[in-house]
Curated annotation (Swiss-Prot):
<feature type="binding site">
    <location>
        <position position="11"/>
    </location>
    <ligand>
        <name>GTP</name>
    </ligand>
</feature>
<dbReference type="GO" id="GO:0046872">
    <property type="term" value="F:metal ion binding"/>
</dbReference>
<feature type="binding site">
    <location>
        <position position="144"/>
    </location>
    <ligand>
        <name>GTP</name>
    </ligand>
</feature>
<dbReference type="GO" id="GO:0000278">
    <property type="term" value="P:mitotic cell cycle"/>
</dbReference>
<keyword id="KW-0493">Microtubule</keyword>
<dbReference type="InterPro" id="IPR017975">
    <property type="entry name" value="Tubulin_CS"/>
</dbReference>
<feature type="short sequence motif" description="MREC motif">
    <location>
        <begin position="1"/>
        <end position="4"/>
    </location>
</feature>
<dbReference type="GO" id="GO:0000226">
    <property type="term" value="P:microtubule cytoskeleton organization"/>
</dbReference>
<dbReference type="GO" id="GO:0016787">
    <property type="term" value="F:hydrolase activity"/>
</dbReference>
<dbReference type="GO" id="GO:0005200">
    <property type="term" value="F:structural constituent of cytoskeleton"/>
</dbReference>
<dbReference type="InterPro" id="IPR036525">
    <property type="entry name" value="Tubulin/FtsZ_GTPase_sf"/>
</dbReference>
<feature type="modified residue" description="3'-nitrotyrosine">
    <location>
        <position position="83"/>
    </location>
</feature>
<feature type="modified residue" description="Phosphoserine">
    <location>
        <position position="48"/>
    </location>
</feature>
<keyword id="KW-0206">Cytoskeleton</keyword>
<comment type="function">
    <text>Tubulin is the major constituent of microtubules, a cylinder consisting of laterally associated linear protofilaments composed of alpha- and beta-tubulin heterodimers. Microtubules grow by the addition of GTP-tubulin dimers to the microtubule end, where a stabilizing cap forms. Below the cap, tubulin dimers are in GDP-bound state, owing to GTPase activity of alpha-tubulin.</text>
</comment>
<dbReference type="InterPro" id="IPR023123">
    <property type="entry name" value="Tubulin_C"/>
</dbReference>
<protein>
    <recommendedName>
        <fullName>Tubulin alpha-3 chain</fullName>
        <ecNumber>3.6.5.-</ecNumber>
    </recommendedName>
</protein>
Amino acid sequence: MRECISIHVGQAGVQIGNACWELYCLEHGIQPDGQMPSDKTIGGGDDSFNTFFSETGAGKHVPRAVFVDLEPTVVDEVRTGTYRQLFHPEQLITGKEDAANNYARGHYTIGKEIVDLVLDRIRKLADLCTGLQGFLIFHSFGGGTGSGFASLLMERLSVDYGKKSKLEFAIYPAPQVSTAVVEPYNSILTTHTTLEHSDCAFMVDNEAIYDICRRNLDIERPTYTNLNRLIGQIVSSITASLRFDGALNVDLTEFQTNLVPYPRIHFPLATYAPVISAEKAYHEQLSVAEITNACFEPANQMVKCDPRHGKYMACCMLYRGDVVPKDVNAAIATIKTKRTIQFVDWCPTGFKVGINYQPPTVVPGGDLAKVQRAVCMLSNTTAIAEAWARLDHKLDLMYAKRAFVHWYVGEGMEEGEFSEAREDLAALEKDYEEVGVDSVEAEAEEGEEY
């Protein structure tokens, strides 16, 4: 069995976790108490959903997940919510005081008190697995727990489970909608720390999701629930191939093999279509060609950046629902002829395609329309460097005046860590720039030196 353990860190991670597990349960027909009427092999069995759920002898399905937050309020909502019976109480771990939006508190002072307990619970989950394939880590870049504790945990996971892959779903601080002044500090520190520990990181930009909710779903003032349900759909599309049998099954390592050309360049851009409200869906066809085209619209991306200014290195299309390979091939052929899409010249225009016959499920009373087919595109493009550039610029403005730095130093961090992290991100931007340069030009430049 190829199991995955999900780790939800901090408020953002936990709330996205709620949305995801709610959706997984609906998709697999698992009731809030963990019973699954359709499951005939009680107490075990090798069903494909067992990658995400373990089964007890009583036929209860328990998510292979851990929820961690340094303060209790958000996890308490899970403890008292609809799905309270789904999780084992030990899977919900909380501390007493929060990280107060401070990376240093999450990573050093408060985080280190709880990290051994968390690793202990993760070890228990790992022992239930026959062939653990890796971890999915959900967190935000901006919060203290999401940045500091998540990076600490990933460092420790690398030590304990060296060869297992670690995929991140990270909430990137939105350019306009900010929840904390020190988000740029936290984001850059956490990116620097986790860069070598993460195998693949799907970034989600709150503002991009806000815009999609406003524009496509006609929600005037989207709440976090709206955002998280949309993010849940995306996570579900990415993990559907792990949980259902499809025509082309993608496992965790396969993502990296196809999307990550160099270890540091592991930030694919996710795009999901169709995002459409029930009123509109009634009047639209949403053919395979249409939803495939929609993926190349910057408006449907999860991070604000413009791929038309960058080049693609790899592209992964994950279809689900009523889709046949013939339609997909036709749609992709059309895209290739349009040529608005530039691939780097060292990578032939490779599209990897996965098809999963399980149609997308929607949460009852949610905003998304029930559709027959959907697609999630994961593309590694040099344009995502724009997101890093934006963040670095904000950090420079604040750090030039050393604003707020004393809060970090006071929690036992050294000021040198800031400049180290900043240099690492400058190098990351440079890496992206170099990857996008045509190889012919690059060789010509080298020739001139000798």
